From Swiss-Prot:
One of its GO terms (molecular function) is transcription coactivator activity. Residues 440-450, 458-502 have a biased composition (Basic residues). Residues 1118-1127 have a biased composition (Low complexity). Residues 1178-1203 have a biased composition (Pro residues). Residues 171-197, 210-259, 389-547, 570-591, 950-981, 1058-1203 are annotated as: Disordered. Residues 1076-1103 have a biased composition (Polar residues). GO terms for biological process: positive regulation of transcription by RNA polymerase II. GO terms for cellular component: mediator complex. The modification Phosphothreonine is found at T970. Keywords: Phosphoprotein. This is Uncharacterized protein CG7065.
Length: 1231
């Protein structure tokens, strides 16, 4: 596509503008000869050359601008083009090679033929331009583009075979052509006048239009010259005695009967004519169908129309000139697109009509048909008939008055026919023509006599039907026998025809009277019958109109009546009801395909209608390939594709698109409609099957998943607590703790963090709130006001029970889950919770303690129902229940919640006894003095605990939680699964031994333990210990090193005090790691006094060292609180402290001689430096002003002090009293 400079590009071709060829103008102005195949040339531009090169793709040769025209006019280029696109004409030209000295003639003939082609098609101007580099890089692509472009071809028009023959004849006919011309010359007379061409043997030799019919067929039916002379003499001099008188118009020439071969030739000619028209209609319908589809494409993409650029150019030039003449606006700034769109819509219709006419014209030229849109079969029938006895056909020029004057005398009618000058004679071998003698008219009386000479031998059979008295001078000459035998042969070939014609005969007088009048009407009617589909079933009328030809229909070689119809049958003539009934009958008659409905079968049917799916077609094929690949791996594995939600959405989308196709009625083929309907049904069915199967499979999968539960997950991240635990161990001198001991301690600490309101509502009278552990570890900023404490022993026993139940459930998993699912329908009742989702139930379970009693009861009932209906769902919800690891795994979720509610009610209804509270309070606070008590304190505490143990056990056994667990005798389950070795000491023993070993120290410090518990705040549950039991919590330390009970006690006690932090501390793992590193750096000077694992840390920690103790690490400004403790006898150094004594808030400030205001966390022990972020008091003797960064705090200005101690210690009269410094050896000296 090339445009002149300044000429705009058609809309849609802005990015498709190619460079105009330099040689284009020279091609248009070249007149030295015809040019063909120029579109095969590519113009190549090199950067260093002024003139481009030209590469011919057809010949694979390269030339420059000076000799490219020589190449285009060469014999090789032209021959190659003809051989590629005009093969028929090329074969005709190759005949010249067989004759000697024909090389020059072949070149001339080729030039003349190329000239004809160029005159017909025009000169091609589509040259492609490219740079040399692009051509060398994309040579194959460009060559393919050139070959696939439009070329003049015999398929697009005439094949030029006739032109090639004409060129050869005009140039130099060869000897074979001359000999064939000589064979066509007739030796009897003047018949050579009608053969002007000489090389075509025409069938006109048997035509009755030529008066020398006998001469042209002398070779077929030889007649002696004497015979001809006798006939001429008889015709000229008079009539024989057996003949009727000659017509008055003149002398008739002799005619002979056609042979079967001649009749077969004329039948073949007619059949070929019909075949040509049938093929013409077929080809026309095919090409028009393609043209219609292209036109539909051009409606949406007009720029793809081949005439679009040229039409735009013409439109623009014409409109541009009009705007210039109008001078109303600037033509260069004018918007031509709106006018062009409307113009192109009309122009496209015109171009379609032009294309249709061109297709018709080309097909008629190809099949050598006439310009009329009708067959010439009837004309051929009239042309190739030899009329002898048939009166049916009379020319339209016959006088109607003479035809109506029919007389019985045969001779009276002869002048009428003689004056009409009929051009053909018809051979009538029928017996029925004798019934109409008045209307018979003949050229030759001899032929009439020959026809009537059959009557004497048939007299016995035909005497009833015709009279023999019409011609008294009948004679039997030599031709009668031959005529009769030939007539009998013709009659015997189609007996059915005569029977049909005899049945369909009308009265002779009526038909003869209307023959001349209705000739034109019957002729037009005959054409309509020829085109109609019912014509061949009603050929009796044709038999009545032309009897003389019907006898030779058995010689028809190519009969179009037995050919299949190429064009699509039109349904417009059929009523919609009839068509719909036929479709229903077809659907009912077709067998329905039986077989299992699978994903592969549905996708296979989808691939069959891929062309109607549009962009969804490739996706369907891709899914089919995946399904087949999965089927190869495992049978029926393709069904798993429907478990993917994206695949189900794709199938739903495909189904809706197919429904849209049916609704829009864009499909004409009823078979495709049935396929799409079936597809829609199958897609819906497999999606339903997948959904139904997915629900059943989900239950089975959940039941199987419960057989292998996930390992126990800790409630908090290990990285959150591990650095703080390691820091506490290092500060206390335990540098060689094994990995197993670390894991055991870490697991125990994290389990302690999991608390719940209902599980901790045991006793609110005494003890320390267990929620403070979260606060001190940085896991919770502020404790909830309504949180209650929890009994430590009950906590541990619940952990043991829960772990044991989990292991038992893993070993003995019930297999009755399907039965429970089936029995779900039998569970009645509804509380309105059936519509809740898993997310709603999760929220309710996590906030179970905030629900009212009625809501809790309803939720428990609903969970009981779910345990029967859907056990897997309840197991999935178990992880959302708080303290899920503190209950038995064999115990259902609803039973656990019910027990929690029962325990809470029992705790509220019956509080603990005062004696029990005092014991718990004493044991809870006794951990504070575990490392600083005197030698007499353990004996007092041990004797007190031993005296009170029976009562304590009796009271604990009467509690609801112990009543429920009394009958359970389950072995202890190891918390840590990493170590394979185990030890048999448990947490109960650890607590009891801590009380036995450290109780005397606290007793010696001051005060009785029993009396101290009277002043505790009621409602706070104490932390107590019980005897060792088989269900005790078991640890598994490393085999190499073992920690003694007292070491473990001191580690945990020191940890709880060391991990205390400011109110603003975030408790992040980063701070813990930083603290751990700092202690590692400063631990070397203190390592000399570090105790080993087998030594009691209290022995070394009992020595006083000035400035070596830690201040209160968790609660700034608590000096007043610590002063209150001495007045009430509740100093933490006066009681036997259990393991968790560090939770009380740190060491007593009165134990230190150089007590300063609380300043935060010491960088290292023993330096006497304390940073006071609150009051900024002067530093100690060995300190300095200027606080370093605190690794445990957030290093922001401190918040107001937070008082965590019980309120009954805050007496105003006791805040001014101070106690002598006392060293608390719990934190130890300088290590």
């Amino acid at each position: 596509m090339s445009f002149l400079p300044g000429e705009p590009v058609p809309p849609g071709f802005e990015e498709d503008v190619s460079r105009t060829a330099v040689i284009q103008k020279q091609i248009e102005s070249y007149t030295a000869g015809p040019l063909i195949g120029t579109e095969y040339t590519i113009e190549l531009h090199e950067p260093a050359q002024l003139r481009p090169n030209y590469f011919c793709v057809l010949c694979q040769t390269c030339s420059d601008g000076r000799n490219v025209f020589v190449h285009w006019t060469s014999q090789a280029h032209r021959t190659k083009y003809l051989q590629t696109h005009f093969q028929k004409a090329y074969k005709e030209l190759q005949k010249l090679k067989r004759t000697p000295n024909s090389s020059g003639d072949l070149v001339t003939a080729t030039g003349n033929l190329v000239k004809c082609i160029e005159k017909h098609f025009g000169r091609s101007r589509n040259l492609i331009t490219a740079t040399g580099d692009d051509f060398r890089r994309y040579r194959s692509k460009m060559c393919s583009q050139v070959r696939d472009s439009f070329h003049f071809d015999e398929c697009a028009g005439s094949d030029f075979s006739e032109e090639a023959q004409r060129v050869i004849r005009e140039l130099k006919p060869d000897e074979s052509i001359k000999s064939s011309m000589k064979k066509n010359v007739d030796g009897t007379g003047d018949s050579n006048k009608q053969h002007d061409d000489g090389n075509i043997i025409a069938l006109d030799a048997i035509s009755s239009d030529d008066e020398s019919f006998g001469g042209s067929t002398a070779s077929v039916v030889p007649v002696p010259k004497g015979r001809q002379k006798n006939n001429l003499s008889e015709d000229a001099g008079g009539r024989s005695k057996n003949q009727s008188p000659p017509p008055a118009g003149g002398v008739n020439k002799t005619q002979h009967l056609p042979t079967p071969k001649e009749l077969a030739i004329q039948a073949s000619k007619i059949s070929q004519e019909r075949y040509k028209w049938e093929k013409f209609r077929c080809m026309l319908e095919i090409q028009l169908k393609q043209l219609r589809s292209d036109t539909e494409m051009y409606e949406s993409n007009p720029e793809k129309h081949p005439d679009y650029p040229d039409e735009w150019k013409q439109f623009w030039n014409r409109r541009y000139k009009q705007l210039q003449e109008e001078k109303k606006c600037d033509p260069n700034q004018y918007d031509y697109k709106p006018e062009w769109i409307s113009y192109w819509k009309d122009r496209r219709i015109v171009l379609f009509d032009i294309a249709v006419n061109k297709i018709k014209k080309d097909l008629k030229e190809k099949f050598k048909l006439g310009d009329e849109d009708e067959e010439k079969t009837l004309e051929l029938m009239e042309r190739y008939k030899i009329r002898v006895a048939s009166p049916r056909r009379a020319p339209a020029t016959t006088n109607s008055d003479n035809c109506r004057k029919t007389k019985p005398n045969f001779r009276n009618n002869r002048p009428i026919v003689a004056t009409s000058k009929l051009p053909d004679a018809v051979i009538d071998i029928s017996d029925d023509d004798v019934d109409s003698p008045p209307s018979r008219s003949r050229h030759s009386h001899k032929r009439r006599s020959i026809s009537r000479s059959l009557s004497p031998k048939r007299g016995g059979r035909r005497a009833v039907r015709r009279s023999r008295s019409r011609s008294p001078r009948r004679s039997y000459n030599r031709g009668s026998t031959r005529s009769r035998s030939r007539s009998m042969r013709h009659r015997s070939r189609s007996p059915a025809h005569y029977r049909g014609r005899g049945r369909g005969r009308e009265p002779a007088s009526k038909e003869r009277g209307s023959s001349s009048r209705d000739f034109g009407g019957r002729h037009s009617l005959q054409r309509e019958r020829e085109r109609s589909s019912e014509y061949y079933h009603r050929n009796e009328g044709y038999a009545r109109s032309s009897r003389g030809y019907e006898s030779v229909e058995t010689f028809r070689v190519l009969d179009s009546r037995v050919y299949p119809e190429y064009k699509v049958t039109k349904t417009s003539s059929i009523s919609p009801t009839a068509s719909s009934n036929k479709e229903k009958e077809k659907e009912a008659s077709e067998p329905i395909e039986e077989g299992p409905l699978t994903v592969v079968s549905v996708l296979r049917m989808l691939s069959a209608v891929e062309e109607h799916l549009g962009s969804l077609g490739p996706k369907a094929l891709n899914l089919l390939s995946k399904a087949l690949a999965m089927e190869l791996v495992k049978p029926n594995a393709a069904e798993d594709l429907l478990r993917n939600e994206d695949n189900c959405v794709f199938l739903e989308t495909t189904k809706e698109k197919l429904k849209g196709i049916l609704i829009a009625e864009v499909l004409d083929d009823p078979q495709k409609v049935r396929v799409i309907k079936k597809l829609i049904t199958n897609i819906a069915e497999i999606i339903y099957q997948a959904t139904f199967k997915g629900t059943n499979d989900a239950v089975d999968v959940k039941v199987k998943a419960n057989a292998n539960p996930a390992p126990i997950q800790l409630p908090f991240d290990r990285n959150l607590v591990a650095p703080k635990l390691a820091n506490a161990l290092v500060l206390n001198g335990y540098n060689n703790v094994s990995t197993g001991d670390m894991n055991n301690l870490l697991h125990m600490l994290t389990l302690l963090m999991k608390t719940d309101k209902q599980r901790r509502q045991l006793d609110n009278n005494n003890g320390l709130k267990f929620e403070e552990i979260k606060v001190k570890l940085g896991l919770q900023n502020n404790p909830s006001p309504d949180d209650m404490g929890i009994d430590l022993d009950e906590l541990m026993k619940e952990v043991e029970h829960q772990l044991h139940k989990e292991s038992v459930d893993i070993v003995n998993k019930p297999t009755g889950a399907p039965a429970k699912v089936q029995a779900a329908d039998t569970v009645g009742g509804s509380t309105g919770l059936e519509s809740l989702t898993d997310s709603d139930l999760q929220t309710l379970l996590q906030n179970f303690k905030f629900l009212s009693n009625e809501e809790q009861v309803h939720l428990i009932g609903h969970l009981r129902k779910l345990e029967v209906q859907d056990p897997s769902r309840v197991d999935r919800l178990r992880k959302y229940v708080n303290l899920v690891e503190l209950r038995g795994d064999g115990e259902s979720c609803s039973d656990f919640l019910a027990r929690v509610v029962k325990i809470g009610g029992a705790s509220k209804a019956k509080p603990a006894t005062k004696f029990k509270a005092s014991v718990m309070g004493g044991r809870t606070s006794s951990a504070m003095a575990a490392s600083s008590a005197s030698a007499t304190a353990p004996k007092v505490g041990h004797s007190m605990l031993s005296a009170q143990r029976p009562n304590l056990d009796r009271d604990m056994s009467s509690m609801p939680i112990n009543k429920q667990r009394r009958g359970r005798n389950t072995p202890s389950i190891m918390l840590d699964d990493d170590d394979e070795e185990d030890d048999d000491y448990n947490f109960d023993d650890l607590v009891m031994k801590a009380c036995d070993s450290n109780g005397s120290a606290s007793a010696g410090g001051g005060g009785g333990v029993v009396g101290a518990g009277v002043h505790n705040k009621p409602g706070v549950p104490p932390i107590i210990g019980v005897e060792s039991s088989p269900n005790a919590l078991t640890f598994k330390p490393a085999a190499a090193t073992k920690i003694s009970l007292k070491d473990t006690e001191n580690i945990i006690a020191n940890l709880m005090g060391t991990l205390s932090k400011n109110g603003t501390s975030g408790g992040s793992p980063v701070g813990g790691n930083r603290n751990y590193m700092m202690n590692q750096q400063h631990g070397a000077p203190n390592a000399q006094n570090a105790p080993n694992l087998g030594q009691n840390p209290g022995q070394n920690l009992g020595q006083k060292q000035p400035g070596a103790g830690y201040s209160n690490a968790g609660y700034p400004g608590q000096q007043q609180q610590q002063q209150q403790q001495q007045q009430h006898g509740r100093n933490f150094g006066q009681e036997a402290q259990p393991l968790m004594s560090g939770l009380s808030g740190g060491p007593n400030a009165n134990h230190y001689p150089n007590q300063q205001g609380y300043g935060g966390y010491h960088p290292f022990a023993g330096n006497g430096v304390q940073q006071n972020y609150g009051g900024m008091v002067p530093p100690g003797p060995g300190g300095y002003v200027g606080p370093p960064p605190n690794p445990w705090a957030s290093n922001v200005p401190p918040q107001p002090p937070f008082n965590q101690m019980p309120q009954n210690f805050m007496g105003a009269q006791q805040q001014q009293q101070q106690q002598q410094p006392h060293f608390n050896n719990m934190f130890g000296g300088r290590h």
